[in-house]
Amino acid sequence: MMLVVFLVSCGSKEDDQSANNSKTKTLSLKAAVPGTSQEIPTYDPDGGGWEVEKWNHKINKSLKELSSKLINDENWRIYADSMCNEFEVAIFHVPKIPKEITTGKIESFNDPEVQIRENSFSSGISTLLNSFSIFNNLERVSFKIINIDKIAKKNIQSDVIVHFAGAENNLDTELRGNIKMLWSNEKEDITLLSVKGDFSASLSSLGKFTDVTESTLGGVPEFKGQFYRGQDYWTSRIEMLTGIDVGGWQGVSVADVNGDGLDDFYIAQPGGLPNRLYIRNSEGGFEDWSKKSSINFLDSSHANLFFDIDNDGDQDLVSGVYEGIVIMENVGNGNFSKRASLLLPSAVPYSIVAADYDKDGDLDFYVCCYNRRMGSKEHHLFARPVPYHDANNGGQNVLFRNDENWSFKNVTLLEGLDQNNRKFSYAASWEDYDNDGDMDLYVANDFGRNNLYQNDSDKNESTRFKDVSEDVGVVDVGPGMSVSWGDYDNDGFPDLYVANMFSSAGHRITSQDRFHKSADKDTREQYIRHARGNSLYRNLGNGHFEDRSVLGGITVGRWAWASRFEDIDGDGFQDVYVANGFITQEDTGDL
């Protein structure tokens, strides 16, 4: 009222009457209530002076349209050639494929021995695809622009990663290429002048995996009701104070819970939704035992791990909930009873790994805690990493020693694992990488460098573990998501595979001169490395590792999360399976 009176007193006499007439209306208006919604501005590639992104926007639009037309066979030749003006040549170097492919195997061919040369873009594509018999059965096409350079006043060149995949006569084929596309930028519309590059090929006669979700779980009402709906459905219906979030960072644990010789699985869920246990039955389907087993927690849960804690021959459960760790004893036939709770006051548990690190005959466990708990400055996803490329303000991981009789002690500091322990840790894995008889620990961290803690249990030192990641060559600066050990070269020493996030945009932007112009060379290189993708480290057998990521052709795992060494085709060599992507939504443009 004081403000209204002041404003009225400042008006002229002519305004007095109108002010008085509107006074009643003004006082009757409802008070404005501040809302919680906010409008996030969309990204404009033409703004900000990033000329490279302006070009990328135009090129990417054309390549996406070409991909769609290739998949759907919608006059793609006409469109491909319409992208060109005064096209010069398409040159592709491809591997030579034998006439006979071993049945039930996956084979890779990487030597570009054969040249394909065509005078039109469309002819180059069709000849390439016909050479591998997938022209008429194309299933997937993608173009990822990783770099753009200005070649001359009127020309630009884009470096592009290309994938073609298709099937013919029970043979699945994938082509992966690194190509250079030369464009004319003389006019408003960018036009293609030439395409040159090398391709590798992978051929599989294993057959396709079959999705059995509906046949094995479709008859379970609780499964359909909870998991056939997306994350957006639940976040719009469940109060955030329960612990639900938009991230979807929940894991799956597999074990023979009821001792019948069949694997069962347990799914962690965000707050407000119960964790679910599904028991395999003799007919090949699954039954929901969540409530019956007493592990249908409603607390926010990211990770769970089954292992035999008390050495009685069955699978007990360590569950990571928002407040900390819950220890559940398997009392028989898949029924559980709570035995202990371990609070984690500084950070939220995200993943759990177990091993007998001290060789006393029982399993201990290590907990990765991604980010610190919310304080006065609350965050819905995670705290802002500082610095972004090498953050040290994440959660505090914890090692719990099993002291028998359901007693566990936090020995993180005692055993030396608090060194470099403020990272954004997603996953960890135990392995005796140096073959000295005890378990070492590798930790994959988001926003920076990873840790390899060497276990020197036989040395007379105050602490057992030491971070040797930099000394042995496995720092792996990047957005670490997962880690897997496996002897891929069959030399008797475990090698290391780390899943990170490959980013084509990151490649383009970090390589530009104007990106972090004031930063030193090492910092800029770390940002560039951050976008590279997944990593493969070969164990040299002398305590050190060699980075074989680029030579091994394994960097592009897209937005990778979980990864695992596994001999998928049974040929005696370890393959790598990588889970990637993000939250599925109705808009296909969303990750």
Q: Predicted regions span which residues?
A:
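Acidic, glycine/proline-rich Ca2+-coordinating loop motifs
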Residues: 10-591
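Bacterial N-terminal signal peptides
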Residues: 1-6
